[in-house]
């Protein structure tokens, strides 16, 4: 107990000389893991003046402690105190009291007896009100009550006239008592993140106020009386709804930092130029159309951020701001810059990303101190020759996909102006289709998210020493230092990250659904894959490297329109753009089909493709560190994609503005990285992966555009891959084929076609084996593969070789998948490639997507493939297709790769989650939880070459730690998860006699059975990816949930398991396990936990995504009063200070999972959770009040048991008593939106689209869980708990593949008439139709189905995903072509009367 005690004594001579005892005045027992106050303290009670008991686990204070009447300072932050004893009144000499980060609900009334108390720190406690006696602490000078539950302050609060610092951030305050006008000595007032709708009038009297925070409220205007605060130097009113700033503000003559970011300003007051001392003005993310001429009066300004507005021109007076050092105007509509801008002699950082600039003024050559300039995504034709004078310029970004910060410039004479200019291969820049917002009725995406993604994609990542801090750190609050509140910013950031991840996960979920369909086909292809595996094993690395190189080239080319000259490159360019939008596209391919048939198709594609990958990367970066073995390679692929995702997250958080630059860079990098990771990196050895990641990370820091980052990491990956692979050409060919396939699929795919595609995808993956497929079918399958990740399978060099043999150019597909950053290449042909890929990183990718897809995906796969809308593919890939033809050059292949990769990325994420959801792929429920996996025996179904389950094998989970074992048990089968490196393994897995009836889950188990460690790794890797990245979690399928649960445990446990064991269990595991393995798999693949390169991400991502629970597993203490609930400040918080991550069993990164973990301590304490947590266990274990956590757990557990009596079916052999996740077992009906809270349903996808509410689709819903429902906003804890319960209740036990998600509920068809008003569009997306790519809900149905509904759109309350449209405005939609249905819906004016058929659970 006293080991860490430090005794500080007054400076006195040595007691040996004095012959007397020294006087102990200070004791420090901080961080000693104490559960009670040490008794030895009381021996010094007469002399003790300062006592530090910080960061222990003390639950109550002994009475003796309050006999220490000499005590001046009592420090008890970060403990488990629930009450403050009334006897504290005995400490009459107490001056400083710190009880922050506990579970204290109220102060005792008699605290008023502590007359000399001057500093009280009580932040992060569930304090709902202050006692009246509190206002009698007349000597109080500093009061910190951040992050509590205060709704009001005592009426006589104004008695505290000596207050100098008052922090009340993150409460629920709506007003201040009028008596506060007496607080004339108040210098700092923080009212941020409360519920104020107007600035309290009492502020006008606080004449001494210097720093004022009121960000994150609901203000609509800034009153002029703020101008009376003449001493005010810092004013933060960002993140409100401010539409007007009154002119009286101009009298704040000492104002230095003025933050107006993220409001609704349309103009600034003309008097703003009177603020002569302002050094920082942030007006980004508003609706400004111009800056007033008076802005030139801000003579002292050094930083001006007006990014994300609608400014078309800058006033010439801006040239008067001669002290300007950082200027950001990203994402505006600037067509030219005033020549006066050359007067900025001190400018060092200039951000002009994403505008409409065609020329730059010569005067910019006078900016002698300019170090970083971002000119990407404009319409520049050249650069002024005066740029040669910029001697200090260290980074210049000219395009979205630039691989290096500086590129050689050549002198040329401009034909129009006859002036000497600088140009290079990147000019002329052309605007990206991304600028066009989607105008499709069928689109269902979140504009805000979309905008956020745009920001992310468009960021330049420069590592400029001078401005690095500005960009990477949150916006500076001047030089002000806030009191070091114990409330950890990391937690808030984590919450934000989780939100982002959740959004992405949802996007991924959608994508994964598509991927699943493909996966089913992939299962079929698995056998062929096995044949190709050996080849791919040897060649995959090289091929992947080649692919990466190609991808990089394509990316670079993509950035410039000139890329079009290269057949391959042009598509790549489109793909890159798509990669930005790809996430959306993959997930919303159908939506895009209709909506994107428009010009925005390409954009959407890119966006869709990119975000999902990025999302995956975010959570999966940990996986980056993979072993050098092929197994590791497979992991690498996943980890790479994870890494990409991670980067994308950063990008999302940071946009153009300097403060956001670094993040945005990551985003861009992510998309490219994802691609590279998926394909080349996966195949590359762990070392190369780590290097690549490091490079990526470096690039991220260096290139804030993120464009560069993407390319360079990918290039490196690709280079490595090339080294590994010898079939770069094949990759290209594959890409070409993929493009073709995409076309075919888009134009021809019917539900049958979709199935065919799925089969074809499998065949294609097996290219060598099935060369016979019709070209159309092959093309389609390629498309699907790409979307699903089959392409990734193809990507493996061996596979490529095989593909070449078949005569299909699937190597290109492979490349494409790689481009996506998913190892979808592998996944698409799980059956065929599994064995082959087992040894290569590609395998991992395949297993992920394949797993998801393979479960009976063949039927619905078409639908998933359909998700790839032709339009989208065409935008990015069709050109490539034309260019590529069958023998397109490698660059075209790269382009195709990108497009398909993008799709694939999306698919990969969606694959496991969505596909599983889609199909009754109910992976074995047993896999649902790690504990289940651990304890339960699972029946592994072996599949023959045709992917038919041969006979269930009952496999007892390995005795590995719960989490790990669980993975071993079958979760939803991870089709590609455990591809073994050798064909023999494959044989083991597949038995000739397989029952097609066996659950899709069963099929995956077959794949899973592959014993190859490489396969295992791939499986794990995918899991890890899923877990790490939200997109993985987005998967609603049970497998997904299982993985989620298992992942944390697995993460830790997998390390311990031998590679072989892992493989076998991995096989047993289903997609879920694989997902859960993601974190663990990453480690598993590495073979050692230390390996996780993603460690960086781990801390964050793991916490939230896969390791989230695990990371915080130890911490039972609430981190904050609100337990950092995802909810906004208003959401209710748990009673306990903070839930432990450990409590959150859903290690899954699924959207809902994130929500749970955020809000509810844990659904139930699972052994798996424990182990998982232990894996990620961070030091900061905190205990939530036992009551709260246990109640929640019991509540959830009980609900689960109530609602999900396990109904095991043959397919459920793997099923444990617990379901991996509530999500896992949702019956399709149960998953319908109506069961979920709106917030969940509306969760934005990472893509930037709103995650469609849970799909009510009969088949889908089962796999599709609320997690898919977007949690655009963090739901309140109660909501989360309910949501979890809902999920649990709806999780249907796994059943045979034939059993539809209906297993839980009988579905009745109901015909409904609805009227949708266009505003401005219909707000939903469709798929299917006689030429469509299939219907994700009913692959065998050629009807038109609703696939997405825009959460806030006109159809949000009328339609649900899965609704079949029978008639629209009198036009029959039966046996109608997809394109015709889209065009009809688009041509209808105003309103559309629809007759739909909805399946309702009876």
UniProtKB/Swiss-Prot annotation:
Composition bias type Polar residues, residue spans: 660-689, 1070-1084, 1128-1139, 1149-1164
Residues where Phosphothreonine is found: 485, 914
SMART domains xrefs: LRR_BAC (SM00364), LRR_SD22 (SM00365), LRR_TYP (SM00369), PDZ (SM00228)
GO CC, any one term: hemidesmosome
Family classification: Belongs to the LAP (LRR and PDZ) protein family.
Cross-referenced Gene3D superfamilies: 2.30.42.10, Ribonuclease Inhibitor (3.80.10.10)
Known partners and oligomeric status: Interacts with ERBB2, BPAG1 and ITGB4. May favor the localization of ERBB2, by restricting its presence to the basolateral membrane of epithelial cells. Also found to interact with ARVCF and delta catenin. Interacts (via C-terminus) with DST (via N-terminus). Interacts with NOD2 (via CARD domain).
Function, as annotated: Acts as an adapter for the receptor ERBB2, in epithelia. By binding the unphosphorylated ERBB2 'Tyr-1248' receptor, it may contribute to stabilize this unphosphorylated state. Inhibits NOD2-dependent NF-kappa-B signaling and pro-inflammatory cytokine secretion.
Boundaries of every PDZ domain copy: 1311-1400
Residues recorded with modification Phosphoserine: 440, 444, 595, 599-600, 617, 712, 849, 854, 869, 928, 1150, 1171, 1276
Compartment annotation: Cell junction, Hemidesmosome; Nucleus membrane; Basolateral cell membrane
GO MF annotation list: signaling receptor binding
Chain intervals for the UniProt region annotation (Disordered): 465-489, 507-543, 629-694, 824-864, 990-1018, 1070-1093, 1107-1187, 1198-1217, 1222-1274
Keywords: Cell junction, Cell membrane, Leucine-rich repeat, Membrane, Nucleus, Phosphoprotein, Repeat
Modified residues (Phosphotyrosine): 483, 917, 970, 1097
Biological process according to GO: cellular response to tumor necrosis factor; negative regulation of monocyte chemotactic protein-1 production; negative regulation of nucleotide-binding oligomerization domain containing 2 signaling pathway; protein targeting; regulation of postsynaptic membrane neurotransmitter receptor levels; response to lipopolysaccharide; response to muramyl dipeptide
InterPro entries: Leu-rich_rpt, Leu-rich_rpt_typical-subtyp, LRR_dom_sf, LRR_R13L4/SHOC2-like, PDZ, PDZ_sf, Synaptic_Scaffolding_LAP-MAGUK
Keyword Metal-binding: no
Gene of this entry: Erbin
Protein name (database record): Erbin
CDD domains found in the cross-reference section: PDZ_densin_erbin-like
Spans through the membrane: none
């Amino acid at each position: 107990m006293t080991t860490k005690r430090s005794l500080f004594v007054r400076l006195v001579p040595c007691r040996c000389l004095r012959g007397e005892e020294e006087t102990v005045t200070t004791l420090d027992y901080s961080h000693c893991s104490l559960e009670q106050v040490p008794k030895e303290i009381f021996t010094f009670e007469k002399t003790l003046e300062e006592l530090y008991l910080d960061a222990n686990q003390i639950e109550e204070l002994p009475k003796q402690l309050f006999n220490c009447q000499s005590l001046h300072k009592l420090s008890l932050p970060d403990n488990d105190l629930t009450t403050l004893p009334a006897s504290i009144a005995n400490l009459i000499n107490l001056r400083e009291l710190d009880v922050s980060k506990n579970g204290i609900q109220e102060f005792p009334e008699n605290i008023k007896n502590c007359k000399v108390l001057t500093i009280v720190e009580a932040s992060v406690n569930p304090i709902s009100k202050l006692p009246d006696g509190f206002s009698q602490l007349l000597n109080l000078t500093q009061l910190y009550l951040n992050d509590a539950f205060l709704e009001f302050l005592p009426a006589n609060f104004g008695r505290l006239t000596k207050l100098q610092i008052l922090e009340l951030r993150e409460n629920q305050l709506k007003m201040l008592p009028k008596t506060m006008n007496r607080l004339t000595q108040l210098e700092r007032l923080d009212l941020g993140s409360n519920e104020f709708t107007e600035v309290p009038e009492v502020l006008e009297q606080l004449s001494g106020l210097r720093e004022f925070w009121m960000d994150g409220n609901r203000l609509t205007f800034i009153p002029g009386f703020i101008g009376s605060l003449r001493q005010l130097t810092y004013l933060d009113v960002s993140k409100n709804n401010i539409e007007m700033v009154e002119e009286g503000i101009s009298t704040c003559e000492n104002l230095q930092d003025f933050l107006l970011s993220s409001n609704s300003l349309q103009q600034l007051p003309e008097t703003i130029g009177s603020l002569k001392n302002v050094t920082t003005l942030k007006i980004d993310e508003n609706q400004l159309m111009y800056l007033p001429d008076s802005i030139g009066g801000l003579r002292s300004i050094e930083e001006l951020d007006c990014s994300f507005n609608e400014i078309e021109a800058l006033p010439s007076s801006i040239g008067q701001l001669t002290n300007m050092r950082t200027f950001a105007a990203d994402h505006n509509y600037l067509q030219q810059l005033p020549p006066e801008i050359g007067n900025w002699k001190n400018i060092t950082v200039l951000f002009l990303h994403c505008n409409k600039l065609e020329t730059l003024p010569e005067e910019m050559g006078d900016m002698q101190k300019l170090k970083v300039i971002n000119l990407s995504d404009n319409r520049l034709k050249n650069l002024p020759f005066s740029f040669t004078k910029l001697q200090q310029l260290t980074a210049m970004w000219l395009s979205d996909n630039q691989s290096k910060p500086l590129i050689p410039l050549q002198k040329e004479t401009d034909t129009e102006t006859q002036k000497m200019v600088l140009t290079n291969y990147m000019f002329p820049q052309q605007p990206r289709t991304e600028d066009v917002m989607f105008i499709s009725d069928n689109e269902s995406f979140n504009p805000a998210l979309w905008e956020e993604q745009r920001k992310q994609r468009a960021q330049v990542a420069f590592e400029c020493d001078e401005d690095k801090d500005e960009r990477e750190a949150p916006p500076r609050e001047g030089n002000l230092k806030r009191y070091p509140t114990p409330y950890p910013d990391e937690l808030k950031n984590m919450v934000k990250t989780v939100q982002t991840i959740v959004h992405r996960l949802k996007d991924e979920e959608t994508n994964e659904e598509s991927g699943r369909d493909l996966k089913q086909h992939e299962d079929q292809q698995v056998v062929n894959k096995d044949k190709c595996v050996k080849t791919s094993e040897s060649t995959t690395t090289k091929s992947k490297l080649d692919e990466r190189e190609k991808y990089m080239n394509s990316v670079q080319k993509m950035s410039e329109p000139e890329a079009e000259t290269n057949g391959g490159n042009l598509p790549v360019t489109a793909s890159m753009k798509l990669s930005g939008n790809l996430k959306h596209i993959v997930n919303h391919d159908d939506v895009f089909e209709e909506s994107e048939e428009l010009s925005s198709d390409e954009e959407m594609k890119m966006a869709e493709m990119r975000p999902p990958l990025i999302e995956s990367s975010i959570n999966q970066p940990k996986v980056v560190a993979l072993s050098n073995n092929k197994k590791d390679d497979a992991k690498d692929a996943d980890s790479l994609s994870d890494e990409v995702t991670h980067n994308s997250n950063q990008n999302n958080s940071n946009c153009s503005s300097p403060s956001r630059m670094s993040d945005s860079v990551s985003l861009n990098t992510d998309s490219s990285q994802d691609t590279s990771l998926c394909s080349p990196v996966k195949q590359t050895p762990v070392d190369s992966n780590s290097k690549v990641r490091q490079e990526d990370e470096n690039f991220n820091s260096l290139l804030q555009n993120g464009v560069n980052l993407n390319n360079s990491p990918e290039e490196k990956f690709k280079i490595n891959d090339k080294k590994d692979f010898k079939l770069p050409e094949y990759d290209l060919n594959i890409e070409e084929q993929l493009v073709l396939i995409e076309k075919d699929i888009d134009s021809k795919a019917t539900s049958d076609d979709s199935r065919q595609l799925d089969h074809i995808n499998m065949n294609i993956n097996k290219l060598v084996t099935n060369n016979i497929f019709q070209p159309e079918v092959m093309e389609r399958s390629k498309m699907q593969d790409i979307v699903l990740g089959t392409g990734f399978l193809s990507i493996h060099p061996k596979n490529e070789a095989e593909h070449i043999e078949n005569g299909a150019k699937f190597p290109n597909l492979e490349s494409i998948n790689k481009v996506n950053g998913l190892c979808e290449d592998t996944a698409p042909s799980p059956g065929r490639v599994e064995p082959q890929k087992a040894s290569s990183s590609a395998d991992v990718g395949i297993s992920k997507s394949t797993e998801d897809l393979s479960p009976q995906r063949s039927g619905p796969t078409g639908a998933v493939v359909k998700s790839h809308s032709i339009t989208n593919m065409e935008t990015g890939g069709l050109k490539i297709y034309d260019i590529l033809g069958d023998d397109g050059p490698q660059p075209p292949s790269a382009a195709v790769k990108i497009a398909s990769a993008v799709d694939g990325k999306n698919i990969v994420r969606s694959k496991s989650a969505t596909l599983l959801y889609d199909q009754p792929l109910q992976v074995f429920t047993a896999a649902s939880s790690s504990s289940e996996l651990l304890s339960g025996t699972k029946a592994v179904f072996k599949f023959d070459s045709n992917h038919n389950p041969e006979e269930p094998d009952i496999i007892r989970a390995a005795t590995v730690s719960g989490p790990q074992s669980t993975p071993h048990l079958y979760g939803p089968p991870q089709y590609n998860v455990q591809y073994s490196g050798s064909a023999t393994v494959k044989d083991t897995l597949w038995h000739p006699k397989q029952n097609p009836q066996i659950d899709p889950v069963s099929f995956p188990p077959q794949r899973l059975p592959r014993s190859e460690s490489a396969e295992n790794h791939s499986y794990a890797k995918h899991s890890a990816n899923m877990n790490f990245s939200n997109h993985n979690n987005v998967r609603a399928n049970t497998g997904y949930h299982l993985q989620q649960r298992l992942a944390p445990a697995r993460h830790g446990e997998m390390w311990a398991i031998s590679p072989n064991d892992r493989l076998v269990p991995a096989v047993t595991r289903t997609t879920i396990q694989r997902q859960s393995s993601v974190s663990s798999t990453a480690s598993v693949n590495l073979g050692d936990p230390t390996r996780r390169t993603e460690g960086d991400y781990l801390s964050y991502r793991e916490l939230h995504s896969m390791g989230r629970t695990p990371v915080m597993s130890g911490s039972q203490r609430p981190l904050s009063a609100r337990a950092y609930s995802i909810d906004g400040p208003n959401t209710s918080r748990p009673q306990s200070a903070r839930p432990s991550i450990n409590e959150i069993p859903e290690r899954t990164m699924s959207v809902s999972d994130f929500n749970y973990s955020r809000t509810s301590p844990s659904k139930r304490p699972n052994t798996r959770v424990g182990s998982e947590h232990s894996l990620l266990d961070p030091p900061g274990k905190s205990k939530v009040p036992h009551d709260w956590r246990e109640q929640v757990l019991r509540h959830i557990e009980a609900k689960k048991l109530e609602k999900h009596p396990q109904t095991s079916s043959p397919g459920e052999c793997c099923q444990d008593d617990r379901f991996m996740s509530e999500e896992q077992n949702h019956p399709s009906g149960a998953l319908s939106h109506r069961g979920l809270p709106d917030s969940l349903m509306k969760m934005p996808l990472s893509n930037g689209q709103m995650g469609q509410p849970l799909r009510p689709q009969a088949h889908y819903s089962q796999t599709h869980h609320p997690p898919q429902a977007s949690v655009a906003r963090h739901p309140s804890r109660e909501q989360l708990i309910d949501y979890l319960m809902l999920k649990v209740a709806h999780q249907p036990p796994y059943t045979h593949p034939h059993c539809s998600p209906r297993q839980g509920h009988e579905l009745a068809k109901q015909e409904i008439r609805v009227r949708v008003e266009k505003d401005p569009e219909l707000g939903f997306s469709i798929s299917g139709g006689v030429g469509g790519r299939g219907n994700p809900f009913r692959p065998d149905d050629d009807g038109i189905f609703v696939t997405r509904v825009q959460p806030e759109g006109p159809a949000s309350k009328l339609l649900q995903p899965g609704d079949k449209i029978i008639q629209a405005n009198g036009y029959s939609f039966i046996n109608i072509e997809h394109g015709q249905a889209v065009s009809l819906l688009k041509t209808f004016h105003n309103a559309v009367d629809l007759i739909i058929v909805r399946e309702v659970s009876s």
